[in-house]
From Swiss-Prot:
Organism of provenance: Mus musculus
GO biological process assignments: response to wounding
Domain of life: Eukaryota
Protein name: Proline-rich protein 33
Matches recorded under InterPro entries: DUF4643
PANTHER family linked: PROLINE-RICH PROTEIN 33
Biased composition (Pro residues): 73-83
Region (Disordered) location: 29-132
Amino acid sequence: MALDGDKSLCTSSTQPLIPVAHIRPLPAGVQTVSPRPEEPSITRPPPSFQASVNRESGARVVVPIAPTYRSPGPSPYSPPPAAPEAKHVEEPPTARPAMEPRNVSSLPGASGPSDLHPYPVPKVAPKPSRSGWTRLKKQLMEEAKEPAFPELKPNLEPMQPEVPAPVVGLQPPASRASRMWDAVLYRMSLAESHRDHPVGPGDRGHPLACLNRLPFLCRPRFNARKLQEVVRPPPTFHPILELHSRPKNFNRTAEGWRLQ
């Protein structure tokens, strides 16, 4: 018997200590005051786990159960409080009224309590939106200037009728083609005037048969070569032969030789 008592003491001393939770019922008044949703109960370990623990320890296992009553203070089992987020969310509406006076004071027409002498805001005239075509026409169009009339001075000299001077310098220079055609027509007029006139020894002009008509242009384009041939001065003909007293010797001799 003594040995059995010693064995029971040894086994009790070697077994680990397990905490035991004592559950007490809550009073009826507390339950009505704080009607909060009950937290889900802690899941109990499976029966296989309890059987293994019973075999090892050979003692009763008591599973702690969280009480349903919550104290006013913070509970270690409760989730983290959401007070910082609520404060952070509620901060913008509290800070907004403080920001609105600044925005109002920054407006040009508003005057804050610190602005004792508000300065007038300069008004800028709106610029008319003009298109590119309108601006281009304004640049290209010249503004009409008022004609400046000369002052009338008393003239003591008798009035003389003003003769308009021939305007020569204002005429544009004639082109080369027009000058060639003028020369051709002039030659034709000379040929018609000297058609019946006999050619004398002093006359150098000779009517050309080709001047009776205009040169025929084979191509529709302007041919300057044919006009140049017509415009060339006519060759001079000497109908009377000049007889010299001593005929010219056309025989040539080399230098250093004499004819005997």
